[in-house]
Amino acid sequence: MAKQIVFDDDARGPLLAGVSKLARAVRSTLGPRGRNAVLDKGWGSPKVTKDGVTVAEDIELDDPFENLGAQLVKEAASKTNDVAGDGTTTATVLSEAIFREGLKMVATGADPMALSRGIQKAVDTAIAQIAKMATPINEKSKSDIKQVATIAGNNDPQIGDVLADAFTKVGKNGVITVEEGRSNETYVDVVEGMQFDRGFLSPHFVTNQDEVTVELDDCYILLFEEKISNNKKMIPLLEAISKAKKPLLIIAEDTEGEALATLVVNKMRGILSACAVKAPGYGDRRKAILGDIAALTGGKAIFKDLGIDLESVKVSDLGRAKQIRITSEATTIVGGAGKKADIEGRVAQIRREIEATDSDYDREKLQERLAKLAGGVAQINVGAATETEMKERKALIDDARAATQAALEEGIVPGGGTALLRCRAAVEKLEKATEGDQKLGVRIIRNVLDQPMRAIANNAGLDGAVVVNRVLQMKGKTEGYDANADKYCDLVAAGIVDPAKVVRTSLTNAASVAALLLTTESLVTEIPVEEEPAGGDHHDHGMGGGMPDMGGMGMGGMGGMGGMGGMGGMM
């Protein structure tokens, strides 16, 4: 496939045009008075959203060079969303502003590489200021969490209430999932203890016939990595547990054949209350989860590489739990008898693995394991009147959840673009201490720190420049403009706050992408191929000169059939 190449200003011009188109579409959604964007999905009903990253991800431009710029900025928005869960619109607005300011400097002869280094220095300074400004929030305070969640949820107090309820129930280490509900109400379901998606292997184990569940109190738990099919190896252990008059849960790769039949018969005869479920996960992940359950219940996971046979397993090797509830689809362990030190050690190990992994999938699975050990699992069931509203609301709550999690991690700063604006003084100080073209790079960041506030004010129907100047004249570090109430006030006291992690990530990713764009000297894309029309009329001789008479097969030639009405005689 042939390629087309452009250089220098011919490359940077289309890049800026593409970035500007994307930023203009996304910018209009910023702030409490931001406007909606309507996205045509090509099927079903159109999607109405105020979520910046959703708008950005839907944009593809015709011009291949412009599209390169748009796609790079889209990546900044997506990365911000992945890391912090919010701040995607801010990242897009800042990317465009930094790139636009940088191009002005390049046009006057500045070295793009020196500009890039200056930009990075200024960003590091601003990030240090954001960290100083950040105030930790109390994870047990429902009102603190509600403030952050309400702002992240587009100033919807119901979203704030629901997320505050979820976080106070499971803590910052808990997992909160957002699912589509089956009613108009939005509510939280909390699963206490450890739950995994494996159900009973036989309906004969059921103890509660009304709810079709197995309920085992003060229960022993056998954790076995391999399949169990030989009942002879299992009988010594079953006899010991039967004497103790306690129920037994077997978690193994599978329990089948004679072994399963023995458990069922003993259960039905009232000799031993038992149940068997398959171990969750596969391969190394299964080993890890069995290790988690062992820590939680104070038992020992019997792995095949330990060389321990089922016959030699003692009652002291088993875990214990106050209550176990098993449905056909899931097992929940509540009140494990594990030592606190062992559980905390396991939690610390999982946290180290989370920090070390580069895989988003692995990180998500590790966080699920962490939640089941350290917190709990809360499911938010989203209710709405229509499917379109449901999808929009679900996306909004999911973003607000991630932003609230970010606030619990790194604290909060004044919202409404104020935190970035308050970094300007420190960046100005750095500018005075920097020389050459790097000084111009620092100046670029100084000039763009007001852009998010300008966009919020413009969307609220005010002059952004006037609002920025008014806020700069205010002496309090937490004072700024509340676009929702249309007033100037102490934003933290009014509950207008942003997670520090969101602000930091937005600026970092925006500067990274803008610096890449500024140091671009050439663009290479495939030459667009114009597609042939799908069908031609009877004058189209595209089939080649060898078959000229095929023109008569055009739709016009079907008139000779006398019209479909003539088929009436066949009825």
Swiss-Prot record:
**Subcellular location per the Swiss-Prot or TrEMBL entry:** Cytoplasm
Q: Got a GO cellular component term for this one?
A: GroEL-GroES complex
Note the SUPFAM superfamilies from the entry: GroEL apical domain-like (SSF52029), GroEL equatorial domain-like (SSF48592), GroEL-intermediate domain like (SSF54849)
**Keywords for this entry?**
ATP-binding, Chaperone, Cytoplasm, Isomerase, Nucleotide-binding
Xref: InterPro entries? Cpn60/GroEL, Cpn60/GroEL/TCP-1, GroEL-like_apical_dom_sf, GROEL-like_equatorial_sf, TCP-1-like_intermed_sf
Pfam families linked: Cpn60_TCP1
Job description of the protein = Together with its co-chaperonin GroES, plays an essential role in assisting protein folding. The GroEL-GroES system forms a nano-cage that allows encapsulation of the non-native substrate proteins and provides a physical environment optimized to promote and accelerate protein folding.
The similarity comment for this entry is: Belongs to the chaperonin (HSP60) family.
Q: Which HAMAP family match?
A: CH60
Self-association state and partner proteins as the record states: Forms a cylinder of 14 subunits composed of two heptameric rings stacked back-to-back. Interacts with the co-chaperonin GroES.
Stated name of the protein: Chaperonin GroEL 1
The record lists the organism as: Rhodopirellula baltica (strain DSM 10527 / NCIMB 13988 / SH1)
Q: What is the lineage of its organism?
A: Bacteria, Pseudomonadati, Planctomycetota, Planctomycetia, Pirellulales
